[in-house]
Amino acid sequence: MASTSYDYCRVPMEDGDKRCKLLLGIGILVLLIIVILGVPLIIFTIKANSEACRDGLRAVMECRNVTHLLQQELTEAQKGFQDVEAQAATCNHTVMALMASLDAEKAQGQKKVEELEGEITTLNHKLQDASAEVERLRRENQVLSVRIADKKYYPSSQDSSSAAAPQLLIVLLGLSALLQ
């Protein structure tokens, strides 16, 4: 048999004890950290799965749904408001255009009224003149009628006014037709 020689690192005894104590300390520290972190994790897990937590989660989800619905309704309301504002602007523009048109129509109507008033004044003057002329001709006609009647009773051969009577009658009829 061959001889075997084992070479061991010779470690002093005191170093081995220090190592064991160090490993034991690290192990205890790790175990302590696991326990310190594990206990709150277990408590958190229990609380997270509790009925109150689930109710809170449901409430949060409902709030999100309601918030989303309200945001949609707000968006629709804002769009509707913008549409109404656009319609109001159109209506205001139309009203302004109609008011301008109405003012123009009023001015034109006032001008027409003034023209008609002037024409009425002119026609009234013509009517007064024609009435005065008719009155004058009526008096002349009466005078001529009296003369004609006198000539029937007192005939005269040199009377030229009897030929003017039919002409005067035609003038009177023409004037009365104009007045009507």
UniProtKB/Swiss-Prot annotation:
Gene3D superfamilies named in the record: 1.20.5.1700
Broad class of the protein's primary localization: Golgi
Post-translational modification: Monoubiquitinated by KSHV E3 ubiquitin-protein ligase K5, leading to its targeting to late endosomes and degradation. The GPI anchor is essential for its antiviral activity.
All ranges on the Extracellular side of the membrane: 49-161
Complexes and interactors: Parallel homodimer; disulfide-linked. May form homotetramers under reducing conditions. Isoform 1 and isoform 2 form homodimers and also heterodimers with each other. Dimerization is essential for its antiviral activity. Interacts (via cytoplasmic domain) with ARHGAP44. Interacts with MMP14 (via C-terminal cytoplasmic tail). Interacts with LILRA4/ILT7. Interacts with RNF115.
InterPro entries: BST2
Membrane-spanning ranges: 21-48
Induction line: By type I interferons. (Microbial infection) Down-regulated by HIV-1 VPU protein. Antagonizes its function by targeting it to the trans-Golgi network, sequestering it away from virus assembly sites on the cell membrane. VPU also acts as an adapter molecule linking it to BTRC, a substrate recognition subunit of the Skp1/Cullin/F-box protein E3 ubiquitin ligase, inducing its ubiquitination and subsequent proteasomal degradation.
Effect of residue 92 to A: Loss of glycosylation site. Impairs anti-viral activity
Subcellular location: Golgi apparatus, trans-Golgi network; Cell membrane; Membrane raft; Cytoplasm
UniProt entry tagged with the keyword rRNA processing: no
Function: IFN-induced antiviral host restriction factor which efficiently blocks the release of diverse mammalian enveloped viruses by directly tethering nascent virions to the membranes of infected cells. Acts as a direct physical tether, holding virions to the cell membrane and linking virions to each other. The tethered virions can be internalized by endocytosis and subsequently degraded or they can remain on the cell surface. In either case, their spread as cell-free virions is restricted.
Impact after mutating residue 53 to A: Prevents homodimerization and inhibition of SARS-CoV, HCoV-229E, and HIV-1 viral particles production ex vivo
GO CC terms: apical plasma membrane; azurophil granule membrane; cell surface; extracellular exosome; Golgi apparatus; intracellular membrane-bounded organelle; membrane; membrane raft
Glycyl lysine isopeptide (Lys-Gly) (interchain with G-Cter in ubiquitin) crosslink location in chain: 18
Topology in the lipid bilayer: Single-pass type II membrane protein; Lipid-anchor; GPI-anchor
Organism of origin: Homo sapiens
Name of protein: Bone marrow stromal antigen 2
Consequence of changing residue 91 to A: Prevents homodimerization and inhibition of SARS-CoV, HCoV-229E, and HIV-1 viral particles production ex vivo
